[in-house]
Every structure is written in structure tokens, then in C-alpha cells.
Amino acid sequence: QKLQHLKTKDPLGKKPIYYRGNRQDLPFYDIDLNLLRFNPLNDRIHTDIKEYEQTTGMDFNLLPITKMNTIISEMIWSKHESKNKKTLEDIKRKNQLEVGVVTKDGLIVDGNRRFMLLLKINEESSENRPFRAIILDETYDDDPTSKFNIKLLEMDIQDGEDTKEDYSAIDKYIRVINFVD
């Protein structure tokens, strides 16, 4: 609802993406970080969550969203700390340059790492930097077709750009299992 309200305002610009079988120029907006959450369906994050559940014996989905965000943030930071430190300094200096993608309920489709870094910047400096992103008109939970199309978009974004981090063998395996489900 707050995200949908943002879409009634003038966008900051448009970004081309390939979505639902077409190239589309979709508007993007600055979104308050409090309206967003990490995507536990993201293949890399999902792998870490499964490991967390195995280690702690806890069902991750039963945790409050703020606790989920904190745990996922720590997972992302510690996985590639030196790379994250470099990108953190870059975002501090230049702001967020790459536009992310979120669902209409605030789940991040593309940009989990940038979201984590912006949370860290805001926490350390008491700034209120927003997350710049396209807001999709659907969620993973709307229907199976929506979930399928959003996963295809996520895969296209992750695999379609040279600058994205490579997936490990386990992440690729989990991706295939999750895609088939």
C-alpha cells in the first residue's frame, strides 16, 4: 500500500528490463528502507537460511521480519566481507547507482546486497538513504504464474550481467530444485 502509493508519484526515471516475455522500460522510485525486506526466496539467501535452520533448529519463517533482516544482513556481509567493504565505500561516495527491483509487498527481487549496504550506512551514520528500485505490480504469493515470472526475472538479472557474483555449485543446485518446485 505505501509502495503502491509511491507509484502514483512521478518516477525518478525508467530502467529497461526483460519481464513477462517482453523488454519493458519500467519506472523506478526512491523507497524508504523500512518498507522493504530481504528476499528469502533468493537462491543464495535461501541456501544460507537452510543452513541456519539446520544449525539452530529454528524455522526461519517464524522469526519477526526485523530479526530476519538482521540475520540475512549478517549472512550477506560475512559471505564476502572484503568485497562488501569496497562496495560500501562506493555507495557512500556515489550513492546507489544500480536500480533494484522489488515486489509490491516490498520483497527484494534484485538488490539484496545493495539493500544490506544501505541499511548499514543508515545505521552507522543516522542517515536515511532510500533504496532506488522498480516496484512490480505483483508478489510471489499472488499466483503460480506471478511467482514463476518473478523468479525468471530474478534469474535473468542475476545471470544476464557480467558484474554479478557467480553462484556456487550448491546455490545452483538449490536454484534448480526451487525452480522445479
For the regions a language model picked out, list residue spans one by one.
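Short, charged/polar connector segments at secondary-structure boundaries
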Residues: 1-129
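Amphipathic, charge-rich alpha-helical segments that serve as recognition/docking helices
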Residues: 72-78, 123-181
